[in-house]
Amino acid sequence: MNVHKRLALATAAVALGAGLAGTVPAQADQPSVSAQAATQRRDVCFSGACGSATVTFQSHYSAKVSMSVADNRCDAHPAKVRILADQYHLSTGSRYTWHGPWRVNHRGCHGGTGPAWNKTFVGGDPLLGMKVEICNDGVKCQTSSEMYNPY
């Protein structure tokens, strides 16, 4: 290799190194994956009921939960909603699902989403994720996809 080519390669390497030395990784200003995934929402709608849950995971054991449901069919079957918490039992090493209490909207089809339910869930076992279940007074029920706990 002649002297000019060596000098050109050396100069390019120094310039590239100097340019990279002053840069910051692209992820430095972006929120962490946990922060991005901490708040999740699922909607479940079918003929008879429509509802949603928004979950903000706070730790490996807790989450803020906000749910609401509406009767969208006017068929005298009240719409109801509950949260399902997927947990890991530490002493047995097995997964289980805690079924929250039903929240019923008795306002009928013209009463909107009814009273919203806003509570903090705190489990004694690690919280793996949550789902929302919507029912039209037991006539038909549907469950959302999982909202995974990023912690």
Region roles according to the model:
Residues 29-151:
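Post-signal peptide N-terminal regions of Sec-secreted extracellular proteins
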Residues 1-29:
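Secretory targeting and sorting signals
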